[in-house]
Structure formats: C-alpha cells, structure tokens
C-alpha cells in the first residue's frame, strides 16, 4: 500500500509540469570582452533571447553563419537576438573573424 501511495503522490507532484505548455521565453546574457565571446549559456530554447553585451573598446557583432541573426554591437553597447530555430548555430564577429562560437538551441 505504501508503494501505491508513493506513486500517487509522485504523479500528483509531476502533474503541474506535464501540461504540454512550453516554458516562458528566457533571456540569456553573453558578454564580449578582450576580443572574446564570454561563456555561452546552456539551456537555450527556441523563442529565448540572447542579450549580447559588448564591454570591449571595439565594435563587434554576433552574426550567425546561417543568417538567422546579426547583431551589430558598438563599443560599450548591447543588442538582442531571438533564437528562432533549434540546432547548433555557428556565429562569429564579422569585424574580427577569429571570434567564433556555437550556440546550441533546443526546441
């Protein structure tokens, strides 16, 4: 009987999380400093926003190689991009091609 109660409680506790409704979009931050993209966040999903913060003294960009986003980032400024598709999205700074990264976006 204890096992039945435990299973019933576990199912009841999980019910609010299994309603099929997608989580609300989140904002993730990537800092650009010293000619590098900072650590890339985990847990990015379609619909989430990335806030790119340029702390460098130079203009940079966050430009997807597939054209899905392109944020120009003057020195000391920031910009946002919304992730519209799932997958591994390679990106680079169009002004400094050695600055690269890959964002992993889940559905």
PLM regions with names:
Residues 2, 8, 16-107:
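Extracytoplasmic copper-binding redox domains, predominantly the cupredoxin/blue-copper superfamily
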